[in-house]
Amino acid sequence: MNKLIQSKLELLPTSPGCYIHKDKNDTIIYVGKAKNLRNRVRSYFRGSHDTKTEALVSEIEDFEFIVTESNIEALLLEINLIKENQPKYNIMLKDDKSYPFIKITNETYPRLIITRQVKKDVGLYFGPYPDVGAANEIKRLLDRLFPFRKCTNPPEKVCFYYHLGQCKAHTICKVDSQYFKELAQEVAAFLKGQDDQIIEDLRGKMAGAAQAMEFEKAAEYRDLIQSIGTLRTKQRVMAKDLQNRDVFGYYVDKGWMCVQVFFVRQGKLIERDVNLFPYYNDPDEDFLTYIGQFYQEKSHLKPNEILIPADIDEEAVRAMVDTKVLKPQRGEKKQLVNLAIKNARVSLQQKFDLLEKSIEKTQGAIENLGQLLNIPTPVRIESFDNSNIMGTSPVSAMVVFVNGKPSKKDYRKYKIKTVVGPDDYASMREVIKRRYSRVIRDGLTPPDLIVIDGGQGQVNIAKEVIQEQLGLDIPIAGLQKNDKHQTHELLFGDPLQVVELSRNSQEFFLLQRIQDEVHRFAITFHRQLRSKNSFSSQLDGIEGLGPKRKQNLMKHFKSLTKIKEASVDQIVEVGVPRAVAEAVREKLNPKTQEQEQAQLREVAEPQIGLE
């Protein structure tokens, strides 16, 4: 068991869900389900196992998990993931066996049947159910509640089910077909979870039977009510409409955002994409940007339908992706969005927990890092990163780690002074020169290692300044990210080369934490500066709105977007005079020329009233 797995095992939730084992090539080799993820996944790495399980465990290099709301959801999600990924150790479930649905047939006198094939006909399908036994149990309950016809070919006289009260014998008793249409609607409502009225009716019948001292009949009604209760678990991982849809959820904390995307294909949740990154603006704005990039830069195919959380502007998403976008308020789709949000929260918390645990093991990490780079143990590490958007408000930041732990009192922020436009190399040159000129001038303690968040170009710029211009002898390394913005490669040496570094080692975790921290610190500073500049510039020139009132507005509303959406009364509540509040509204929401002309026409037109 490697150190990555060891750390992640300690952070597993006790929720039900699916776990996904991966090998050294990041290939899925096994998918399993669990009532308790923590207990089940830990069991693989404890005690002895049979030969097959030992072979599986020997190949596991990493694992992921997806939290579900129930054991049934975990089971159905497992089915979908196995069919989609065909893991080598899931031999038992690799076949394309279909799972049962309950169907209301589209006939004049409809029937309730169990089928394994979902066709694009006008029948109503409900399920799937984990096995035919579960489907039969529900159908038996429906047969007792709703008297649909049972026979494929109508008999010449009433059948056994008629005497049980489970069939109306429509051909003999001349039952109107409209009755069955209404009955089908009741069954559909029941199978969608709308069963409160049915339970209320059964309770009334049970009370009536008990009052009439028909205790056997009352017991039957009681059993029916209990049976309905046991079937109220609603699963969300498989839908009935066979639609292809992407389900988005996100969660933010401590300056980081996690976005989870569930891919539902042919009604089945088959895969998920998870990404964690620092966010720049309001969370909802950066989430919108992520969705746009998701379908452009990552070349994902657009589905028939996209589901998003309730606080996101669906019109903005629709304009970017040009497909159907929904913000579900209730039902199965809403539950899918909630599940994506829940998994985003779990993933983000796991990242924070892993970082905290890595702090406990840093002394060995810095010693190993020194040996790996053939330098003295880097007790003090200084790391740099730049941040700008299209060249606006360019900044840089430095974080310091001492003995493998962040020394926040030594962190520094830099506004770029000499660079115009988005020039990352020139920005790095300026900041490195400013920092280490001061180290020389003020006699400060130099670092044992400089880590640049960037590739070969940025590292060579830093080397040129440190070694050639300032004459310092400080080792310099670079950290490159992959396309998912994750720590990928360590660059070091002269000439620069990729250093072989196990992704499961403590020194890799240390470098990852340093890179994440400097990136977070730079982005936070950039966001604050850009927000301050934007806020100040848009509110400048409003008579009666001084620095104190601007500060109060920002503290209360958090962003310009929220101030734009606020009413005059809401702005007044912050302590701004009404006349000034009206000026703020007018400045942030200027009328278009068409609106002004329409208002002038309205004033000019004579008003006609009734006397």
Swiss-Prot record:
It comes from the Bacteria. SUPFAM superfamilies: C-terminal UvrC-binding domain of UvrB, GIY-YIG endonuclease, RuvA domain 2-like. GO terms for molecular function: DNA binding; excinuclease ABC activity. Residues 196-231 form the UVR domain. It is found in: Cytoplasm. The keyword Nuclease does not apply. Residues 14-91 form the GIY-YIG domain. Keywords: Cytoplasm, DNA damage, DNA excision, DNA repair, Excision nuclease, SOS response. One of its GO terms (biological process) is nucleotide-excision repair. GO terms for cellular component: cytoplasm; excinuclease repair complex. SMART domains: GIYc. The keyword Nucleus does not apply. PROSITE patterns: GIY_YIG, UVR, UVRC. Its main location: cytoplasm. Gene3D superfamilies: 5' to 3' exonuclease, C-terminal subdomain, GIY-YIG endonuclease, UVR domain, UvrC, RNAse H endonuclease domain. Residues 587-611 are annotated as: Disordered. Pfam families: GIY-YIG, HHH_5, UVR, UvrC_RNaseH, UvrC_RNaseH_dom. InterPro entries: GIY-YIG_endonuc, GIY-YIG_endonuc_sf, GIY-YIG_UvrC_Cho, RuvA_2-like, UVR_dom, UVR_dom_sf, UvrABC_protein_C, UvrC. The UvrABC repair system catalyzes the recognition and processing of DNA lesions. UvrC both incises the 5' and 3' sides of the lesion. The N-terminal half is responsible for the 3' incision and the C-terminal half is responsible for the 5' incision. Belongs to the UvrC family. Interacts with UvrB in an incision complex. This is UvrABC system protein C.
